[in-house]
């Protein structure tokens, strides 16, 4: 008789399948942090120009079961099975974005605006090629050739600036730089430029020197969609953008062109060149946002964004601050704080302490370091989504000025609580839809 074998111990273990518990029950730490962020958004005034409030429908799409689906490739040419539903969604979002902007071809897979720009670089440039873009110090973007960015490391980056008096793009300088350096790629667009860009003149300069013209409309795409800012699509060889900011969609990017050859190269550069599987839950949310932007009321929203920003900028100027370029044509304004003797980083911290969020920002030819700055950037896309109008933005300007005066006088500790009460009262009068 062989040795006895002890029976296997019986262990009671949890079901190894995926949990059906909601977030609060499953992960209190994450749920608590999200709840705190919901409170912050609900009770504060958002002036960050690159932020917005999406609709409940956009949130629902992004939080859907599409999170589970892999879909490498493009509609009807995938490397995975089970893609019929995501193919339908991606077909829809491409059709909608082309309808929205009057373009012939679109790639909606870039995970961000930066990756949309990288897709253009990979598709149309070779390492060492020359690119010409707006200087970061004049309101440009990191991805337009800043030395700390891959665009400034992989390519020979040259910049143009703004007129030192008007703070508007110096188109004569653009032409001079283009003739001297003969860039392969000429870039128009930026992250802190408040004026309308002359796309026709950029097209002329690009044609003169044989450059490809790329327009990065990440900041003003929603204004283009709403008909209150000129469209770059008829002028540019390729257009990139984010889907958030003024477009009021999820965080992501896209690329547009009317050139079939460029479109093919952009597709190959995006996948497999830069990315693997697309984020289909985000792409679904993009479809929802583009559908919303196609509605007539979105034009009224875009118009209100611009009008509100002009009111805000003028009220700040009336209070003694300087608005670079003398005003704004879009959703953002850059404010020079030097008349108050306050730096951008101090202003950002002080305003956040009373419930107003914005960002420190360099002014043209700023003498301060990037983490200090002489200015702040303000925007009206988010507040306008909330329902703020001209009266509210005049009040907000007053709260900003009151806070900065308190900083200068050293009385913020005493004044801050009352300012925050005013902020919370105003925010409560215009609740978020979720």
Curated annotation (Swiss-Prot):
Alphabetical GO biological process terms: glycine biosynthetic process from serine; tetrahydrofolate interconversion
Name of the top EC class for this enzyme: transferase
GO cellular component: cytosol
Catalysed reaction, written as an equation: (6R)-5,10-methylene-5,6,7,8-tetrahydrofolate + glycine + H2O = (6S)-5,6,7,8-tetrahydrofolate + L-serine
Subunit structure as annotated in this protein's UniProt entry: Homodimer.
Organism: Rhodopseudomonas palustris (strain ATCC BAA-98 / CGA009)
Record's protein name: Serine hydroxymethyltransferase 2
EC numbers, comma separated: 2.1.2.1
Function: Catalyzes the reversible interconversion of serine and glycine with tetrahydrofolate (THF) serving as the one-carbon carrier. This reaction serves as the major source of one-carbon groups required for the biosynthesis of purines, thymidylate, methionine, and other important biomolecules. Also exhibits THF-independent aldolase activity toward beta-hydroxyamino acids, producing glycine and aldehydes, via a retro-aldol mechanism.
Keywords: Amino-acid biosynthesis, Cytoplasm, One-carbon metabolism, Pyridoxal phosphate, Transferase
Superkingdom, taxonomy of origin: Bacteria
Pfam family for this entry, one: SHMT
InterPro entries registered for this protein in UniProt: PyrdxlP-dep_Trfase, PyrdxlP-dep_Trfase_major, PyrdxlP-dep_Trfase_small, Ser_HO-MeTrfase, Ser_HO-MeTrfase-like, Ser_HO-MeTrfase_PLP_BS, SHMT-like_dom
Keyword check for Cell wall biogenesis/degradation: no
């Amino acid at each position: 008789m062989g040795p006895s074998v002890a029976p296997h111990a019986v262990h009671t273990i949890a079901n190894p399948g995926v949990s059906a518990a909601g977030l609060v029950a499953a992960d209190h730490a994450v749920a608590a942090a999200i709840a705190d962020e919901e409170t912050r958004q609900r009770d504060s005034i958002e002036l960050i120009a690159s932020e917005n409030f999406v609709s409940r429908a956009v949130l629902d799409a992004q939080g859907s079961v599409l999170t589970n689906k892999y879909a490498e490739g493009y509609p009807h040419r995938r490397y995975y099975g089970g893609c019929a539903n995501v193919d339908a969604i991606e077909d829809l979002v491409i059709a909608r974005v082309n309808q929205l902007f009057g373009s012939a071809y679109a790639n909606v897979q870039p995970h961000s605006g930066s990756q949309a720009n990288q897709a253009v670089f990979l598709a149309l440039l070779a390492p060492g090629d020359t690119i010409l873009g707006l200087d970061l110090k004049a309101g440009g973007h990191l991805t337009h050739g800043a030395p700390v960015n891959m665009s400034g490391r992989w390519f020979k980056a040259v910049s143009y600036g703004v007129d030192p008096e008007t703070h508007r793009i110096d188109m004569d300088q653009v032409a001079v730089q283009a003739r001297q350096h003969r860039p392969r790629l000429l870039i128009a667009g930026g992250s802190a430029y408040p004026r309308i860009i002359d796309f026709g003149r950029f097209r002329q300069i690009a044609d003169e020197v044989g450059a490809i013209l790329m327009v990065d409309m990440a900041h003003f795409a929603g204004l283009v969609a709403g008909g209150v800012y000129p469209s770059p699509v008829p002028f540019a060889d390729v257009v990139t953008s984010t889907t958030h900011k003024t477009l009021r969609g999820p965080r992501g990017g896209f690329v547009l062109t009317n050139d079939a050859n460029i479109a093919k190269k952009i597709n190959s550069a995006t996948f497999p060149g830069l990315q693997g599987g697309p984020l289909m839950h985000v792409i679904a949310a993009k479809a929802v946002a583009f559908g919303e932007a196609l509605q007539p009321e979105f034009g009224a929203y875009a118009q209100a964004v611009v009008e509100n920003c002009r009111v805000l900028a003028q009220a700040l100027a009336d209070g003694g601050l300087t608005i670079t370029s003398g005003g704004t044509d879009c959703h953002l304004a850059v404010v020079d704080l030097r008349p108050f003797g306050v730096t951008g980083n101090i202003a950002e911290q002080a305003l956040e302490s009373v419930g107003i969020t914005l960002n420190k920002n360099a002014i043209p030819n700023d003498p301060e370091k990037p983490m200090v700055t002489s200015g702040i950037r303000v925007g009206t896309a988010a507040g306008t989504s909330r329902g703020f109008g001209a009266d509210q933005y005049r009040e907000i300007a007053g709260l900003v000025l009151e806070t900065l005066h308190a900083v200068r006088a050293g009385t913020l500790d005493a004044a801050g609580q009352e300012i925050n009460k005013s902020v919370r009262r105003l925010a409560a009068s215009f609740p978020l839809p979720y």
